[in-house]
Swiss-Prot record:
Ranges per topology, Lumenal: 1-161
Residues on Cytoplasmic side: 183-199
Gene Ontology CC entries for this record: host cell endoplasmic reticulum membrane; membrane
Disulfide bonding pattern of the chain: C52-C133
Organism for this UniProt entry: Human cytomegalovirus (strain AD169)
Name of the protein: Unique short US2 glycoprotein
Membrane association type: Single-pass type I membrane protein
Glycosylation sites: N68
C-alpha cells in the first residue's frame, strides 16, 4: 500500500505546472551523497548567513562566507530525498570580493513539491565545503500556485494544507465566474468595462 501511495504521489507531482524531473539518482561516489558538513581541513572561513525559504513553489536562498579567498566554485543542488538536481543560478546572484567574502542571493528558482533541502557545494581555495539549508515554507493560498500547494500537501500528507488550497481556489473560480456572468449579462455594465479597459 505504501509503494502504491508513493507511485500515486509521484505521478501527481509530475503533473501541472512543474512538468520536469530531477537529474536522476546519483551514484555512490558522487558529490550529492557526501555528508552535510564541511570537509575543509583548515577552517579559515566564517559562515555569516545561510537561509532559504520556498514561496509558492519558488526557492529563495541567501548567505555569505567571510575569509581570505581568491577563487571559488558555487554549486547549489536540490535534494529530493536521495535524488539530486543541479540548480542553475544567474551570475549576478553571486557576489565575490577576492580576499574578503562570498555572498549569494538566489531568487525565483523552480523546485518540485518533493523538495527537502538545499545543498550548497562550495570549493574555496581547493577546500570543499558543504552547507545545508532546510527551507521555511511560506504559503499564499490566494496566489496562482494552487497546483504546487496541492502537490506539496499531498507529498507531506498535510491534508489541512490541501483543504485550504482547494477552498481558496474554489473561491477564486467562483468569483471569476460570477464576474464574467455579471458583466456579460448586463450589456450596459459590459460596455462600461470595455470602455474602462480600452481607455
Amino acid at each position: 500500500m505504501n509503494n502504491l501511495w508513493k507511485a500515486w504521489v509521484g505521478l501527481w507531482t509530475s503533473m501541472g505546472p512543474l512538468i520536469r524531473l530531477p537529474d536522476g539518482i546519483t551514484k555512490a561516489g558522487e558529490d550529492a551523497l557526501r555528508p552535510w558538513k564541511s570537509t575543509a581541513k583548515h577552517p579559515w572561513f566564517q559562515i555569516e548567513d545561510n537561509r532559504c525559504y520556498i514561496d509558492n513553489g519558488k526557492l529563495f536562498a541567501r548567505g555569505s562566507i567571510v575569509g581570505n579567498m581568491s577563487r571559488f566554485v558555487f554549486d547549489p543542488k536540490a535534494d529530493y530525498g536521495g535524488v539530486g538536481e543541479n540548480l542553475y543560478v544567474h551570475a549576478d546572484d553571486v557576489e565575490f570580493v577576492p580576499g574578503e567574502s562570498l555572498k549569494w542571493n538566489v531568487r525565483n528558482l523552480d523546485v518540485m513539491p518533493i523538495f527537502e533541502t538545499l545543498a550548497l557545494r562550495l570549493v574555496l581555495q581547493g577546500d570543499v565545503i558543504w552547507l545545508r539549508c532546510v527551507p521555511e515554507l511560506r504559503v499564499d493560498y490566494t496566489s496562482s500556485a494552487y497546483m504546487w500547494n496541492m502537490q506539496y500537501g499531498m507529498v507531506r500528507k498535510s491534508y489541512t494544507h490541501v483543504a485550504w488550497t482547494i477552498v481558496f481556489y474554489s473561491i477564486n473560480i467562483t468569483l471569476l465566474v460570477l464576474f464574467i456572468v455579471y458583466v456579460t449579462v448586463d450589456c450596459n455594465l459590459s460596455m462600461m468595462w470595455m470602455r474602462f479597459f480600452v481607455c
